[in-house]
Amino acid sequence: AFLLQTPRDMGDFRLTDHHGEVFDPARLEGQWTLIFFGFTYCPDICPTTMAFLNNFIQQLEGTEAADTQVVMVSVDPARDSVEQLAGYVPFFNPEFIGVTGEFLDIHRFATALNTPFRKVPGQGTDYLIDHSANVVLVNPRGDYHAFFKPPLDLAKMKVTYRSIRVLWDR
């Protein structure tokens, strides 16, 4: 994991979750959040990372499990509607949250979290998106705290996550 020396305020944002509810900074407060930027038509990195995050969450216990949420933010809002995300994200874990919104709002949010993405040009409607596979960690104040860089390792990520939480609780 790469810890930010000083956790960073992510600014204001207003997106929509896969239930059609508002997803804004208030939704990140009071618990730890793991954010992954992906898209439902992604052939490899996204399903692999979502399955990994489900395994990770299953390994947590007690308060760790209770106050950790996982969010997948779509980098393909043109195809990833609320309905599309509702059929995709809960497949990995019914507690996971899928988020979409206007392209510029998502781009601004991704930029604040150092997770760039771009559409691969010249593929018509069957396009791919180049995107970061980092998993961002947001602290209970709603600030960008750290990120995990692939290849993700379950045992290492668990130990690191616990350490970060212990330091936070001091």
Regions found by a protein language model. Give the residues of each.
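Conserved helix-turn-beta segment immediately C-terminal to the redox Cys motif
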Residues: 31-32, 48-72
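Short, internal strand/loop/helix patches
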Residues: 86-132
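Thiol-based oxidoreductase modules, predominantly thioredoxin-like and allied folds used
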Residues: 65-80, 95-104
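Thiol-/selenol-based redox modules, centered on thioredoxin-like
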Residues: 123-170
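Short active-site neighborhood of thiol/selenol oxidoreductases, capturing the structured segment around
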Residues: 23-49, 53
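Short loop/turn microsegments at loop-to-beta-strand junctions
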Residues: 10-11, 33, 132-134
